Structures are given as structure tokens and as C-alpha cells.
Amino acid sequence: MTELADYADKYQCMRMERRDGILQVTLHTNGGALQWGLLPHRELPLAFHDISNDHDTRAVILTGTGAEFSGPRVTNVGHPLFPTRPSMEVVDRLLTEGKQGLMNFLNIEVPIISAVNGPAWRHSELPLLADIVLAADTAQFQDSAHFTGGLVPGDGMHIVYPLLLGANRARYFLLTGQTLSAQDAHALGLVAEVLPADRLMARAWELAADIARKPKSLVRATRMVLTEHLKRHMQDYLGLGLYAEMLALMDRPGA
């Protein structure tokens, strides 16, 4: 078991605060919007593991900082994020972190509410894996970093979006770099509520408080049964997707 004091200040890319059993996790880079890179790729799996081992938390709110949930948006189509072949040491680390990240998120045994405060350009599958997804009316959802950025969408995108959108819509979304507005995402069933930005966090805390008041065993067991099918999909397909992503990275000139 862990306690909040053991990990609250442990990570550079997130702030954590807990009140009345509700843990708010705010993603950031140097106090601004999260800029995806090797640091959050390494830290998020570890943080989710710590959170999952803290039984004093009754509900989790995941949100971002400022005007974006996660960036930066990749707009240089045709210029891959990894222009040269990474070392096997880097590949090995990416595989391990990639396998742990989403599974550790799903292993948090209390309900998670995502409060998507703005565009999720990078790893938009993460907030969509929450039990309740709220979005500011300025939010957008895109996979800007994978296929259109020169990477195989094999680290969870290939699982989450087909489950949520259906196979054909998801393949179009991933192959074209389509952007979904908050309103589009709501109409397609990805988002439960779209709110004005200044109401987003209040609504997230309202929902979390309602969950946290319920019996602990009820809360934890419900989270377990609602995520079991997602874990099974991850177990079946995440490893293969990650290896496909890394294999394609090897088809690059050496550094």
C-alpha cells in the first residue's frame, strides 16, 4: 500500500491534491499544458501504479493545465517524430512503459472522471478510458502523433478508438488524423457531457463527491466490473500493437 505523501510530489509532469477522498491529478509541463514526450511516457505508468495502491482515494479526477489537455499537436505531416532509428535501449524502454501505462490506469480500482479542459492532440485515448468523460466546449480529440506523424498507432489507439467509435469510423479517424470537436465526440458517444470551460471542474468534483460518498466496497467492485473487458482487450492486443509500432521504427536510417 502507498500513501499520498509517498508520491504526491514525486512526479514532474503532474500535480496531485486530495480532498474528502477525491484525488485530482493535473497533467502539466513546467506549469503549462502537458507536452507529450519521454518524461510523461515514463512517469504516467509509475504514477498510476502508485495511485492504484492507495486505498484512501475514493475517486480520481484527471485533467490538464491551461488551454490544452495534451500536446503538442503534430502538424508536420511527412516529417516523422522519429526521423532516425532509435537505439534498442530506447525501444526496450518504450515497450515496457507502453505496456504498463494503460494497464496501470485501468488497475486503479476506483472510478476515474476525465475533465478534458481543451484539445487532446496527443494520446487522446487516455482520457477516453475514464469511467466518466467530461469535456470543455473547447476540447478536441485527435491522434496527431501516430499514422499521420509517421508512427503506427499501436500503443492503445488501435484498441480504444475502435471500441468507442466502431471499426470503420476508428480506422478513418486514425488514418486521416481527423479532429473531433467536443460536440462531435458527444454525438458519437465518446463524451458524456460538454460544458463551458468555467463549469468543467465544478461538475467533475460534483460527480466525484457523489461517488466518494458511496460505500468503499461498492465503489471499488463497480470499477472492477466496468473495466474488466477493457483489460482483456489490452491483454489481447496491446503487446502486438506496441511491437508493430517498434518494428516500423526500425525502418529508419540510423542515427
Question: Which residues does each PLM region occupy?
Answer:
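Short acidic-hydrophobic, aromatic-tinged amphipathic segments that line or gate anion-handling sites
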Residues: 134-135, 191-203
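Glycine- (often His-adjacent) and acidic-residue-rich active-site loop
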Residues: 56, 64-100
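Hydrophobic/aromatic residues within transmembrane alpha-helices
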Residues: 25, 62, 126-128, 185, ...
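Conserved CoA-thioester-binding segment of acyl-CoA-metabolizing enzymes
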Residues: 1-63
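CoA-thioester-processing core
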Residues: 101-107, 115, 120-174, 203
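Charged catalytic carboxylate motif
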Residues: 39-43, 97, 104, 203, ...
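C-terminal alpha-helix plus adjacent terminal tail
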Residues: 1-23, 29, 69-70, 76-81, ...
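Short, structured loop/turn "capping" segments at alpha-beta junctions
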Residues: 167-171, 180-187
